Amino acid sequence: CRGAGQLSNRYGKIEDIVLGLEVVLPDGRTIRTGGQPREAVGPELSRLFVGAEGTLGVITRAWLQAWPTPTGNGRSAWGYASFGAALEAMRRIVRRGASPAVLRLYDGIESERNFGVDRSVHVLLAYDEGDPVMVDATMAVVTAECEATGADRLGDDLVDRWFGHRNDVAALETFISKGYVVDTLEVSAPWAALDRIYSETVAAMRAVPGSMLVSAHQSHSYPTGACLYFTFGGLVEPDERDAYYTAVWDAGTRTVLTNGGSLSHHHGIGLNRARFVREALGGGFGVLTAVKAALDPNGVCNPGKLGLPDAFGGAGWPNP
């Protein structure tokens, strides 16, 4: 996992926050990496272990960047007639150098479910915190670009509503308890590909027999692109759940990769995505396996993850 908190536009993902690590290697040695604001001493070893999902060693200590307590904040909510128009606004905001802590876009289905608006409305939320001067400047850019791209100003209370319920997964748990298969799939892609990936991936996952609902939101933005976060739910017979789950993941992932997106933005690979790693990395997969062989020749660290060979013959997912 390369975790991305909900305010990552301001503070970064975990690989941006880690300053140094203590790692126990597969042979028992302990090393210390990083610790300086910036270094130029060969490859940055901290990044070798962050996101390696335990396949190269065990992280036992971490030194993280910290920030002063925010003294100001600002917020706004906007409604768009299309997902693509809102994506363009977000692109323009970050390309101007503004990095609001929260810049999130919900498609019509998720906007209706989370904010009670009509399904034709795509809700964009913006929130920033920090030094008041910087916050005001950031929110001014948000306002200017949203107005320039045809958004309707919605009530700022939608941002407060989001903060109050952002970690509430009770609705999903209700569906799961009724036998639905529910999961999420997050990816990243360049700005030019995002709208196409959104529409085609939703369509591909909906086309899998048994799918009842597929929706998406955009949750992490960068100058060159952003993250799309899909949620799907399906209802099939109990003995068909594994097959459905595999099929909907295959449909979504293949569509994303075909259209130039990534395999994962922050959740990582684990077992479920392992079958796609070789394709996603291309020639880089050989480098990854060479690093694994050099650091862990006996394959004792988290066998079978990241699509790497399992020295102990463990079953992958889906089971062959």
Question: What are the functions of these language-model segments?
Answer:
Residues 31-49, 246-260, 289:
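Short, hydrophobic/aliphatic alpha-helical segments
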Residues 60-62, 197-198, 274, 303-304:
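Short hydrophobic alpha-helical segments that form membrane-spanning helices or hydrophobic packing faces
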Residues 76, 182, 271-278:
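Short beta-alpha connecting loops at secondary-structure transitions
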Residues 260-275, 304:
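A glycine-biased, small/acidic residue-tolerant capping/turn segment at secondary-structure junctions
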Residues 1-104, 301, 317-320:
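FAD-binding subdomain of flavoenzyme oxidoreductases
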Residues 29, 273-320:
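Activity-critical C-terminal alpha-helical subdomain
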Residues 68, 74, 79, 85-251, ...:
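C-terminal substrate-recognition/cap domain of FAD-linked oxidoreductases
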Residues 31, 100-102, 152-155, 263-265, ...:
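Acidic/polar loop patches that form or flank catalytic/metal-binding clefts of enzymes
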